[in-house]
From Swiss-Prot:
Self-association state and partner proteins as the record states: The basal body constitutes a major portion of the flagellar organelle and consists of four rings (L,P,S, and M) mounted on a central rod.
This protein's UniProt keywords: Bacterial flagellum, Periplasm, Signal
InterPro entries with a match to the protein in the record: Flag_FlgI
Organism this protein belongs to: Yersinia pseudotuberculosis serotype I (strain IP32953)
Cross-referenced Pfam families: FlgI (PF02119)
Protein location: Periplasm; Bacterial flagellum basal body
A molecular function GO annotation: structural molecule activity
Biological classification of the source: Bacteria, Pseudomonadati, Pseudomonadota, Gammaproteobacteria, Enterobacterales
Name of the protein: Flagellar P-ring protein 2
Amino acid sequence: MSGLIKTRHCFVLLGLWLVLPTASAQPLGSLVDIQGVRGNQLVGYSLVVGLDGSGDKNQVKFTGQSMANMLRQFGVQLPEKMDPKVKNVAAVAISATLPPGYGRGQSIDITVSSIGDAKSLRGGTLLLTQLRGADGEVYALAQGNVVVGGIKAEGDSGSSVTVNTPTVGRIPNGASIERQIPSDFQINNQVVLNLKRPSFKSANNVALALNRAFGANTATAQSATNVMVNAPQDAGARVAFMSLLEDVQINAGEQSPRVVFNARTGTVVIGEGVMVRAAAVSHGNLTVNIREQKNVSQPNPLGGGKTVTTPESDIEVTKGKNQMVMVPAGTRLRSIVNTINSLGASPDDIMAILQALYEAGALDAELVVI
């Protein structure tokens, strides 16, 4: 009886240890991916019909060929070398991600993108499409009405207004899974955990925490990315074990702060704790104005010459007033950005200054360009 009480106490203590988080700890499930448990990309080609004159134009030949092939499957024979000119049809590519573990009969969302020169997919219907994996096998069938978030309006004069992207749409639950992708998750004796942010310290902390929770030799850190875990072979026991595994609290260690910016959109994201060493910053604003005009040369009426036009370019470069900003050591980057903004700098200027600070060794952070 006393042995049973001790066993119960052990399970209670283990449960409390798994539930109660430590300082700055995170659940293991948010830090790692399980090797072999991942999504797979699917792709297909088909036609969207029912468009209100916004489909592919005559110069897109493969749309007419696809339409003729489809009609032939339904017993409709077109004359040879006849190009069906239809404005209500668009050739499209279909893409989707098959989540891990999905089986036959389940539905997934799909994205429909125009391949030709269609103006809009709004109001169209996707015809039955086979979605294939990288191995060429068919894993899903797609069909349905396309939902488009963008719109394009065009007047008789040729002027047009476009909001968002009308040539890309989605079909929620538009594909039905017909074949499940096999996984080796239940086959191997070990489960491999891949860290989302590789770090030797984080990998070691994961192994130590799992060994404390489930016993010695349960987990072994293989590298800065991989941690090998011994798991039960029985399917039910393995699922229960993995559910406990995901809730184990891990001290991932301090991650190096990051500065991320997108050069295309001008977006700048600064992580917490980014510091700057002592530096002096000077950034000149350059404005380039280029004006193009054509000069007409009219010859003498009796000279027999021809009237010609010659292009003339007027380029003007204006340099703004430079200001030198002194940055003391230990300054938070947020303060520097506020100072730069007060000088009227654009996001492009901020990105240029951050790159210069990084190259000068004055930025204590990882610089990521996307």
